[in-house]
Each structure stands twice: as structure tokens, then as C-alpha cells.
From Swiss-Prot:
Record keywords: Ribonucleoprotein, Ribosomal protein
An example Gene Ontology biological process: translation
Protein name: Large ribosomal subunit protein bL35
Lineage start: Bacteria, Bacillati, Cyanobacteriota, Cyanophyceae, Synechococcales
Organism in which the protein naturally occurs: Synechococcus sp. (strain RCC307)
Sequence similarity: Belongs to the bacterial ribosomal protein bL35 family.
Molecular function as annotated in GO: structural constituent of ribosome
């Protein structure tokens, strides 16, 4: 069987934890930040876990990620 190709766009957007979960960045932390509170901006800067319903989709895009 040939090697599977990794979707490069997904490889740049997701990271795998030690337990095999996928982490992603949060939205709304790119621009238009003046009116957002510092607390909200700190929260948006943290990583989030990909929902379990999307786990299979992400794992197909990243065949060698854990």
C-alpha cells in the first residue's frame, strides 16, 4: 500500500496531544481587537480541543499524527 499524503493545510492548524486529542486555535483573535477585553483576548489566545465529532475528519487529514 502506498504512503498516505498529509493535508498540509491541516498540519499547520492542528497539534496532537500525548493522549491523541487534536488541539486547535480559537477564532476571533486575529484583528479588530481594540474593543475586546484583555480577559477575552487572553482566553482567545489559548488552544482548544477539537470536538469529538470532528476527530475522525481531522485524523483522516493527518494520517501519521498519533
Amino acid at each position: 500500500m502506498p504512503k498516505l499524503k498529509t493535508r498540509r493545510a491541516a498540519a499547520k492548524r492542528f497539534r496532537v496531544t500525548g493522549s491523541g486529542k487534536f488541539m486547535r486555535r480559537r477564532a476571533f483573535h486575529n484583528h479588530l481587537l481594540d474593543h475586546k477585553s484583555p480577559k477575552r483576548k487572553r482566553y482567545l489566545g489559548t488552544m482548544a480541543v477539537v470536538d469529538e465529532r470532528d476527530h475522525d475528519r481531522v485524523s483522516h487529514m493527518l494520517p501519521y499524527a498519533g
